[in-house]
Amino acid sequence: MKILLITAEEWNDYVYGNGVLTNWFTGFDAEFAQIYTSPGLPSNKVCNKYFQIDERQMVKSLYSNTKAGREVKMPTNEREQDAAKSNAQRKGIYGLFKKLSLWMHTPIVMLQDFIWITGRYDKVALQLFIDGYKPDVVFCPQLGNPKMWRLEKLVKSMTNAPFIAFTGDDEASYQQVNKSPLFWLRRWYCHNGLKNSVKIFSHYFMHSKEQAQDYTNEYGVPTSTLYKCGDFSNEFVKKSVGSPIRLVYAGRLYCNRWKTLVEIGKALHEINKHGERMVLDIYTQEALTNEQRKALSPENSVYMKGSVNPQQLKEVYRNADIALHVESMDKKNRLATRVSFSTKIIDLMASSCAILAVCWNRHCGYQYLRDNDAAFCVDNYSDILPMLQRIVDNPSLVQNYAQKAYECGRKNHTREKIQKQIRDKFEELIAKKHANE
């Protein structure tokens, strides 16, 4: 089987550690090629053929005879490999747009949309790349947007292979909160763009059951859920519960996640009035504001630990009792992350820790953990203290829920099971295409 990937980012395991492409396709019996739209270089052990179109090329195509798109090779010498390990997206025009978008997000994104829908592709080079590879299926993991939709339609015109999409985000619904008229203008444009673009896909994978049903109802496209896989090859080994019980959060503090951690800290302050029975360690590479530093403090049994690499994080989890999955409870961020299923959830299942999820009850990750009884679940700040008090008073619950999390992962998220799901769908659509020829 020959699989052609169309993605926004380069497949680089140094820049995007533990990414879904490597997670899904390591050991997958197939050949891979990738078309991507970022300036970085690829670095992985799975894919060998690449075609790059980036923003700099697209801008240049607007004022010169040079068209955008070229085949690139995997870095081989030490200098090229070092360059691949650095985040190329922080450089050049792409990096400039990234920085500016922090201050004026929607205008910059609309400018990027304009560049990508008016820039000129090197269609001859792209056609040669596709003809030389002859894909059996085209897979598009994406956050749908005008850039990707135009590229996907172009590739669709160059091959009769079936197209399959995956999204883990709210691509174009109106369930958002934003005061900017420009945001809603672009949202309207994307909503209509998705209606026209979804027609090229024979199947749509996504994390959220609710979103999958919405897409089937509104666009008529077949859908199903698809999650990350994890390592559940060993038998579950019960470990003793620490004293104090140790909670761990590892990840970013954005989208007001830090405010949820503050509420946990407030509950810990109450629990620990007569001695430290439960603590929270936070591992993040983000610099704290003064407000965050004051709220996330040892006074509330919250300890900031800095950043760790993936291997070190495994050791952190081995020495912890409960791993946290948290999202913001404010309306804007609740809606923004509603259909997002953090890829870390599967890692937490395999971590040997119990999981505590503090999220909105319509968040798809929360719903999944709750429906599978794979975590302690809290959907209201006022319920954090009672839940933590219950755990402190009954430490054996930690062991019980650590096992439940692991068994859920073992039942639903082994590499064999997830890869079989992907392969079966790809083979089904390839066979259907051949039958119709």
Where are these regions (language model features)?
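A short, active-site helix/loop in glycosyltransferases that binds the activated sugar's phosphate group
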Residues: 39, 192, 196-223, 366, ...
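Carbohydrate-associated surface elements
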Residues: 210, 228-229
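Nucleotide-sugar-dependent
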Residues: 256-259, 313, 323-349, 355-367
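Conserved catalytic-core segment of nucleotide-activated headgroup transferases in glycan assembly
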Residues: 231-234, 240-295, 303-311
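A charged, aromatic-enriched C-terminal amphipathic alpha-helix characteristic of glycosyltransferases
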Residues: 379-382, 386, 395-427
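Membrane-proximal helix-turn-helix segments that form the acceptor-binding/catalytic region
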Residues: 121-124, 128, 150, 154-158, ...
